[in-house]
């Protein structure tokens, strides 16, 4: 799958040089392939992302509209499991979005999944 910068993908979408549905279809094929190799996602949000892009009206000024995004699994995402890779949060489904998630959604970012992380973001530090 070809990789684009945000600006490149935005321009392709706005100029109708790429079909957003086909792009996301190919993107999720790649996500599923890489998930089997790397186990990089805690949650994959294919249905939500595909539903989201159906409703989008993209203009030249809205640079993030239609752009796929991945959030670490410690950011609250309303209605989508948020575990922070912790057993004690394995069933937690937030009733609100984190402020940064809300801002990115308002800009038109389409969530494709929640990425794995060290439990509760408490990984080993290597700073001196």
Language model segments and positions:
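Gly/Ser-rich catalytic/binding loops embedded in alpha/beta enzyme cores
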Residues: 1-128
């Amino acid at each position: 799958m070809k990789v684009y910068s945000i600006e490149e993908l935005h321009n392709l979408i706005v100029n109708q040089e790429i079909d957003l549905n086909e792009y996301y279809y190919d993107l999720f094929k790649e996500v599923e392939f890489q998930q089997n190799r790397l186990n990089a996602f805690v949650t994959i949000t294919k249905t939500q992302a595909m539903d989201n892009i159906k409703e989008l009206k993209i203009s030249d000024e809205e640079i993030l509209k239609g752009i796929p995004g991945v959030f670490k699994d410690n950011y609250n995402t309303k209605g989508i499991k948020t575990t922070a890779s912790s057993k004690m949060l394995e069933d937690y489904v937030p009733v609100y979005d984190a402020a940064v998630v809300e801002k990115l959604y308002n800009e038109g970012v389409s969530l494709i999944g929640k990425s794995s992380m060290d439990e509760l973001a408490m990984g080993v530090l290597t700073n001196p």
